[in-house]
Structures are given as structure tokens and as C-alpha cells.
Amino acid sequence: MKKCYEFVKKYKSKYPLTLAFRLKKHCEIVDKHLNPGEEIIYAFVAQKNNDSFDIVNTNVVALTNKRLIIGTKRILWGYFLVSITPDLFNDLTVSKGMLWGKVQIDTVKENVILSNIDPNSLPEIETNITEYMMEEKKKYKEREEDE
């Protein structure tokens, strides 16, 4: 089983324009919350905010075989973790600005905005998240129909 940091390191070397800091600490949070049998399929980093000039909200976004996890380690103590299961996923919006890209993940309960992303990575992020979520949503619908 690959650790989150290996995926993030690969992403950062491939897309160096993404603004991100303290990656190992953020990855530790994601790794800590992986459930038994859960494996990371894809991971990337971004700032979790709507403002391109706010660069202190680095989050690690990990797509696992069961859900999407967004985690960040706070500077002094504590951390934040958001878990998005396929049944709560609604929509994904990708936008490219002059310097960076932005990904908006719309869920039943909230709208998660990820910014300061290398624009060259946007197609890869969109493809990985959308294809996985749509495939999993089909499974949820099949289960509901069987019941």
C-alpha cells in the first residue's frame, strides 16, 4: 500500500506550479484516517479557499477506493479533515485563471473550493475524480434498485 506522501510527491514533481507547503504533515493526517481496506488511488495538493492570494491553507486531496479525503494539519495543534463519499458528490467544476487553476467540488452539504493549482494538472484531476465518482455512483444506484 502506497502512502499518501508518495502520491503527493509524484504530483508535485510533475506539476511544480501548484502552491503547497508542509506536505508531509498534511499527508500524515490523510494516512491516519484511512480505513482498513482503503487504498489511495490518486492524490494532489491545493489551497482550500476561493482567494488566489491566500496561500496558507494547503490541503492534501486523496481519492481512495471508497471516498475523497481532504486533510490539513494546523500549524500549532489539531487538524481538519473532510470526507466526501460518492453518494454525496454532486458536481465538479474546473476553471483556469491567468496563473493557477481552481477546482470546485459540489456536494450535497457544501461546496469545496480548491485553488492555486498548476493549470496543466486540471485535466488529470478532473478525469480521476469524475471517472471514479461516476463509476461509484452507478454502484450506489444498483444497490438501491436491488433493495
Where are the language model's segments positioned?
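Acidic, Ser/Thr- and proline-rich intrinsically disordered linker/docking segments
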Residues: 1-34, 53-54, 77-147
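The phosphoinositide-binding surface of pleckstrin homology
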Residues: 38-53
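Soluble periplasmic/extracytoplasmic beta-strand elements of cell-envelope proteins
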Residues: 41-43, 62-63, 69, 104
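Conserved beta-hairpin
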Residues: 49-78
